[in-house]
Each structure stands twice: as structure tokens, then as C-alpha cells.
């Protein structure tokens, strides 16, 4: 495992320090989100998200982050959202009710606002959840919150790295990986490595952090080889 990891170090560094990982940014924000964001457009002009997120969920998370920073409510909103996610896990009927498209928008909105009041959520949290409820986006809440947590972690200098392997990394190899990541990401950042076991990758590893993915799995290499072998060969050009 260590040899497979070391053989990919130089390639890993190349990928990690560039923007070569494919990403597509949405050309337009959800209209209601734009309205939410422009409420304080002049005061948020100097706030930048610590990492660029893509997709509709990333846009929601980014605008909430900007609003939270300007209102000095980042920690409170983070806590509120974590509590809401936990509440939906422990009360699945309520969660299903808030996401059910057949529930009238006004009823769904009233339920969310009442829940926010009872939980004593901050006003920005309440407004944001109400926005999602009004536009039928509560079904995306878990994904949005995960994106938002990426931003808050980056804001604090924390970098979460997900490493997928067939078997758990031995301590020595995890230490080597962490040291390599620290060198790439830079001093002053706190790196947290989370390991995920997935036998379907056959071997090697997949490293994901800060919107970057380095796939050094045997599964992917085998798929690439299969595609290469399936391509027709033009013997005239040999």
C-alpha cells in the first residue's frame, strides 16, 4: 500500500496545487437566492468565500456564509443548522412533512418558522430556512449544510480530507499522507483525515479535499485500461 501511495505522490501534488479538477459553475443563481443575497449587497461586497463551491447547493451555502460573516453570526448559524439536521433525523415524520411537495407552501413555511422559533434559532437561520421552504428546497438541506460546513471549516483553517481505501490505512501511512497534504495545503491549516472503506475500488486510494479529487484506485486504472483496449487501432498510423 505504501509503495502504491508513494508512486502517486508527484501526480498527487500536481493535481492538488492546480485547478485541473473538472468543475462546472452554475451560470445563474436560483432567483430567490439572489434576492436573499442582494438584501445586503453593498455590505457583503468585501466578503469572499474561502473556497469556491459549485452547483445550486454550493451557491446557497456560499451566500449563507457571506451573510453569516457580515452579521457576525457564523458560529450561531452553524450550530442552528446542525441542530435542524439532527432534529430531522430524530423526527422523520416532521422531515418528510417539510419536504413533501404535496404540502401547501404556506403550511410548510409556517411549520418551519414555528420550529425555528421554538428552537430559538438566529433570525438569519430562520430566514434562510424559510427561503428554502418557500421554494421547495428543503429536500436539499442536508447537502447545503455539508457545503456550508466546508466553508466554515475553511474559515477556521480546518481542512477535512476524505481518503477511500480497501482496508484502513496503517498509522505510518496515514501519517505520511497527512504530512504530504500539509505540505501541499500549507502551514497554519489543520488537517483532519477521515477514512472510508470501499472494497469496490479493489486497491489504491482516492483522496478528496477542497473540491479536488485524486483517484489512484485500481478500479479507475482498470477502467481506463479497458477503454484504451476497446479503442480501434489505426494500423496505418503505427
UniProtKB/Swiss-Prot annotation:
Annotated transit peptide:
1-36
Pfam families the UniProt entry points to: OSCP (PF00213)
InterPro entries, from UniProt? ATP_synth_OSCP/delta_N_sf (IPR026015), ATPase_OSCP/dsu (IPR000711)
Q: Which UniProt keywords apply?
A: ATP synthesis, Hydrogen ion transport, Ion transport, Membrane, Mitochondrion, Mitochondrion inner membrane, Phosphoprotein, Transit peptide, Transport
Xref: Gene3D superfamilies: N-terminal domain of the delta subunit of the F1F0-ATP synthase (1.10.520.20)
Localization per record: Mitochondrion; Mitochondrion inner membrane
One cellular component term (GO) for this entry is: mitochondrial inner membrane
From which domain of life does this come?
Answer: Eukaryota
Any single GO molecular-function term of the entry would be:
proton-transporting ATP synthase activity, rotational mechanism
PTM Phosphothreonine: at which residues? 90
Function as written in the Swiss-Prot or TrEMBL entry? Mitochondrial membrane ATP synthase (F(1)F(0) ATP synthase or Complex V) produces ATP from ADP in the presence of a proton gradient across the membrane which is generated by electron transport complexes of the respiratory chain. F-type ATPases consist of two structural domains, F(1) - containing the extramembraneous catalytic core and F(0) - containing the membrane proton channel, linked together by a central stalk and a peripheral stalk. During catalysis, ATP synthesis in the catalytic domain of F(1) is coupled via a rotary mechanism of the central stalk subunits to proton translocation.
**Quaternary structure and partners:** F-type ATPases have 2 components, CF(1) - the catalytic core - and CF(0) - the membrane proton channel. CF(1) has five subunits: alpha(3), beta(3), gamma(1), delta(1), epsilon(1). CF(0) has three main subunits: a, b and c.
PANTHER family referenced in this protein's UniProt entry, alphabetically: ATP SYNTHASE DELTA CHAIN
Family of this protein: Belongs to the ATPase delta chain family.
Q: What is this protein called?
A: ATP synthase subunit O, mitochondrial
What is the species listed in this Swiss-Prot or TrEMBL entry? Arabidopsis thaliana (Mouse-ear cress)
Amino acid at each position: 500500500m505504501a509503495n502504491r501511495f508513494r508512486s502517486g505522490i508527484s501526480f498527487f501534488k500536481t493535481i492538488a496545487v492546480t485547478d485541473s479538477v473538472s468543475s462546472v459553475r452554475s451560470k445563474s443563481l436560483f432567483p430567490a437566492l439572489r434576492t436573499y443575497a442582494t438584501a445586503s449587497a453593498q455590505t457583503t461586497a468585501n466578503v469572499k468565500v474561502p473556497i469556491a463551491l459549485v452547483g445550486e447547493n454550493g451557491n446557497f451555502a456560499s451566500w449563507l456564509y457571506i451573510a453569516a460573516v457580515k452579521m457576525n453570526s457564523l458560529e450561531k448559524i452553524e450550530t442552528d443548522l446542525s441542530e435542524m439536521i439532527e432534529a430531522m433525523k430524530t423526527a422523520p415524520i416532521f422531515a418528510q412533512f417539510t419536504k413533501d411537495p404535496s404540502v401547501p407552501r404556506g403550511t410548510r413555511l409556517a411549520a418551519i418558522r414555528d420550529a425555528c422559533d421554538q428552537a430559538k434559532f438566529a433570525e438569519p437561520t430562520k430566514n434562510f430556512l424559510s427561503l428554502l421552504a418557500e421554494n421547495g428546497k428543503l429536500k436539499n438541506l442536508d447537502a447545503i449544510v455539508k457545503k456550508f460546513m466546508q466553508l466554515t471549516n475553511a474559515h477556521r483553517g480546518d481542512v477535512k480530507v476524505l481518503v477511500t481505501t480497501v482496508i484502513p490505512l496503517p498509522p505510518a501511512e496515514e501519517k505520511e499522507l497527512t504530512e504530504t497534504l500539509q505540505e501541499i495545503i500549507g502551514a497554519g491549516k489543520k488537517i483532519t483525515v477521515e477514512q472510508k472503506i470501499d472494497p469496490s475500488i479493489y486497491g489504491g486510494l482516492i483522496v478528496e479535499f477542497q473540491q479536488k479529487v485524486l483517484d489512484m484506485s485500481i478500479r479507475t486504472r482498470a477502467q481506463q485500461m479497458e477503454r484504451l483496449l476497446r479503442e480501434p487501432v489505426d494500423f496505418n498510423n503505427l
